[in-house]
Amino acid sequence: MNTVRVTFLLVFVLAVSLGQADKDENRMEMQEKTEQGKSYLDFAENLLLQKLEELEAKLLEEDSEESRNSRQKRCIGEGVPCDENDPRCCSGLICLKPTLHGIWYKSYYCYKK
């Protein structure tokens, strides 16, 4: 019976010591995996940040082009002479020949539509 106890004790000690070694190895593996995961997440985060910055630059560029092109160029106000062939009247105005007053000037003027 003594040999059974000694054998059992020996097996128990071996199991505990090997189990702790596995536990330490598992802990080390988990730390390595989390470090790799962090580096992967950092890489993915940087890649996403670059894509967002590129997209933002494109959007800002389009906005500046749009505002530059949509801005109304210098225009002629109401009651100001204009050229019949090249009217530059402001929006909401049209280049017409004057009625009654101003007919002696023989010129076109910008009037409201």
Swiss-Prot record:
Record's keyword terms, sorted: Disulfide bond, Ion channel impairing toxin, Knottin, Secreted, Signal, Toxin
Propeptide boundaries: 22-74
Endpoints of the signal sequence: 1-21
UniProt superkingdom: Eukaryota
Protein's UniProt name: U11-theraphotoxin-Hhn1g
Similarity-based family: Belongs to the neurotoxin 14 (magi-1) family. 01 (HNTX-16) subfamily.
Tissue specificity: Expressed by the venom gland.
One MF term in the entry's GO annotations: toxin activity
Any Pfam family: Toxin_22
